[in-house]
Design a protein with these regions (language model features):
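Membrane-anchoring hydrophobic helices of lipid-metabolizing enzymes
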Residues: 1-64
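Soluble catalytic domains of membrane acyltransferases
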Residues: 45, 49-158
């Protein structure tokens, strides 16, 4: 994957860092198109084929939340690949220490949640609810972390 994108990686990294540090200059659609472009390069470089099903179930109007199970590290890339509308994410704050993810989250204007701080977590939830009601879309992995063994906890309905 790296060899196939050898010349793209420096350009893509610079552009992603620029968009992340100047996110307010670009519309959500422009930032999402950059992420889709980077995602497409990663998918093609890895000789992967993503076959999405159920896109007709994605609401036509903005202001919704995806609540998928977190199967593995490729989940968000697969969702970006098939989702036609921009979305942001709620992620654990520890991921801001990971290069590349830090820039992706800044570009998406993601909310970072501290799972050890209940007050901060509640404030993030309140802010996400306000943004969803204002028409922004979000992706939240409800069980909190990816499944390393394929077993997921039983989830119940969440009402906003």
């Amino acid at each position: 994957m790296v060899f196939r994108n050898l010349f793209f990686v420096p350009y893509g990294w610079f552009k992603l860092c620029w968009y992340a540090s100047h996110a307010e200059r670009y519309s959500e659609e422009q930032r999402y198109q950059l992420l889709k472009y980077v995602d497409n390069r990663a998918v093609k470089g890895g000789n992967l084929v993503i076959d999405g099903h159920g896109m007709e179930n994605i609401p036509k109007e903005n202001g919704f939340i995806f609540f998928p199970n977190h199967q593995g590290l490729f989940d968000v890339l697969a969702i970006i690949q098939v989702c036609p509308v921009p979305f942001s994410v709620v992620a654990k704050k520890e991921l801001t220490n990971v290069p590349f993810l830090k820039q992706v989250f800044a570009c998406m204007k993601a909310f970072m949640i501290d799972r050890d701080d209940v007050k901060q977590s509640m404030q993030v939830i309140i802010n996400v609810i306000k943004e969803v009601k204002a028409g922004r879309n979000y992706l939240i992995f409800a069980e909190g972390t990816r499944s390393k063994d394929g077993n997921h906890p039983q989830l119940s309905l969440i009402h906003i």
